[in-house]
Amino acid sequence: MWSFLKISLIVAMDKKRVIGKDNDIPWRISSDWEYVKNTTKGHAIILGRKNLQSIGRALPDRRNIILTRDKNFNFKDCEIAHSIEAAFKLCENEEEVFIFGGEQIYVMFLPYVEKMYVTKIHHEFEGDTFFPVVNFDDWKEVSVEKGIKDEKNPYDYYFHIYERIR
C-alpha cells in the first residue's frame, strides 16, 4: 500500500510499557529528548491531537502531521489528517516518517512500521498510557546503546533500534 514510504516509530517506555500519565511523560531524561530531536529532525512526524496538546507546540525542524477525528481542529505550524491514508498521503514525498504517539496512534500505525527506535527505561512508573504489546520475535535488534545515568538522566535506560523481519 505505502511501500514507497519508510515508516518508523520512536518511543520511550518503562519496564511495564508506560509511556504517559495524565497527558504527560512521567520522567525527565534529557539525553532521550536529545536523541528524539536528533533522530527525527528533518523528517515528518505523525502524532495524535492529545500528544500535540500535551507538548503544547509544533516541534521545530520537522513536519508535524496531526491525526485527529476532529474536523475543526487546527494548530499553528501543523498539518492535519483525519485518517491513516490521509496522513500517509501527506508524507508521500518523505524519505522516512516517524510515528510519534500517543497510545492510539502507535496501535493504529504499528502494522505499517518497519523500524522502531525504542528507549527502554529500567524503572517502573505510574501510568495511564501504554505502548502496545509487541511480539519481538517479529523484530531484529540492530542496535543497543546504554544511556548515561547522571543528574539530568536519573534512571538506567537503553536506546534500542529494531527492524521488522520480513
Swiss-Prot record:
Catalysed reactions listed for this entry: (6S)-5,6,7,8-tetrahydrofolate + NADP(+) = 7,8-dihydrofolate + NADPH + H(+)
Family to which the UniProt record says this protein belongs: Belongs to the dihydrofolate reductase family.
Record-listed NADP(+) binding positions: 11-12, 19-24, 48-51, 67-70, 100-105
PROSITE patterns named in the record: DHFR_1, DHFR_2
Gene Ontology biological process terms from the UniProt entry: dihydrofolate metabolic process; folic acid metabolic process; one-carbon metabolic process; response to antibiotic; response to methotrexate; tetrahydrofolate biosynthetic process
Binding site for substrate: I10, V11, A12, D32, R62, T119
Additional observations: Confers trimethoprim resistance.
Gene3D superfamilies according to UniProt: Dihydrofolate Reductase, subunit A (3.40.430.10)
SUPFAM superfamilies associated with the record: Dihydrofolate reductase-like
InterPro entries reported in the protein's UniProt record: DHFR, DHFR-like_dom_sf, DHFR_CS, DHFR_dom
GO MF annotation terms: dihydrofolate reductase activity; NADP binding
Presence of the UniProt keyword NADP in the record: yes
Keywords on record: Antibiotic resistance, Methotrexate resistance, NADP, One-carbon metabolism, Oxidoreductase, Plasmid, Trimethoprim resistance
Role description: Key enzyme in folate metabolism. Catalyzes an essential reaction for de novo glycine and purine synthesis, and for DNA precursor synthesis.
Cellular component terms per the entry's GO annotation: cytosol
E.C. number: 1.5.1.3
Source organism per UniProt: Staphylococcus haemolyticus
UniProt keyword Coiled coil, yes or no: no
Protein name: Dihydrofolate reductase
Entry superkingdom: Bacteria
One Pfam family of this chain: DHFR_1
Domain DHFR: 6-164
Organismal lineage: Bacteria, Bacillati, Bacillota, Bacilli, Bacillales
